[in-house]
Amino acid sequence: MSPFSIVLIGFAMSTDAFAAAIGKGAAMRKPQWRDALRAGLIFGCIEAITPVIGWLLGRAAASYVSAYDHWIAFVLLGALGTHMIVAGLRNGPEDAEDAASDTPKRHGVLGLATTGFATSIDAMAVGVSLAFLDVHIGVVAVVVGLCTFSMVTAGVMLGRALGNLIGKRAEMLGGLILVIVGSVILYEHLSGAG
């Protein structure tokens, strides 16, 4: 997998967390940099660990599915990307409640970690698909963690100003990127380019 594809995956994996961070930032009256950095660190660490867990699970099953690995990567990335696009198109009632609330909130470590795990399930599934590809999972984990740290830190700070405007679009963009990366993996394998 090319370095460019790894960076794309890193940013795609961070878009759910970015959308959640915008929501967290919107819930705060005036988010401080320490709040944003703490959220970025928690989300980034969790998002870096989950693809490694998925990769380990995928490696355990690799010998059984190696003939179909490119299809598995394509289907997993495509399904996750499609799910993210569909989720980005929906506006839930909690979005309106969050936007209407003027009550300042501070988010504790447990709340941030719970949200971080919830937004990193897709990264675990991507890790499973990466187990079937020629990629160094340590590099992917670091890239995903750094991208998530950056995106969440920015998301918290942008949250108050941008709220619902960018949040859903970021999730849709991340989904589109996953669908494209999955399609490129399948194309490279079928065409002999990979």
From Swiss-Prot:
- List the InterPro entries: Mntp/YtaF (IPR003810), Put_MntP (IPR022929)
* Segments traversing the membrane: 3-23, 37-57, 69-89, 110-132, 147-167, 172-192
Q: Which GO terms describe its cellular component?
A: plasma membrane
Write down the membrane topology: Multi-pass membrane protein
A Pfam family annotated for this chain is Mntp
Primary location class: membrane
UniProt keywords, alphabetically:
Cell inner membrane, Cell membrane, Ion transport, Manganese, Membrane, Transmembrane, Transmembrane helix, Transport
Work out whether the entry's keyword set contains tRNA processing: no
Q: Where does the protein end up?
A: Cell inner membrane
A single GO molecular-function term is: manganese ion transmembrane transporter activity
PANTHER family xref list? MANGANESE EFFLUX PUMP MNTP-RELATED (PTHR35529:SF1)
Q: Which family does it belong to?
A: Belongs to the MntP (TC 9.B.29) family.
Q: What does this protein do?
A: Probably functions as a manganese efflux pump.
Please report the name of this protein according to its UniProt entry: Putative manganese efflux pump MntP
Query: To which species is this protein native?
Result: Xanthomonas axonopodis pv. citri (strain 306)
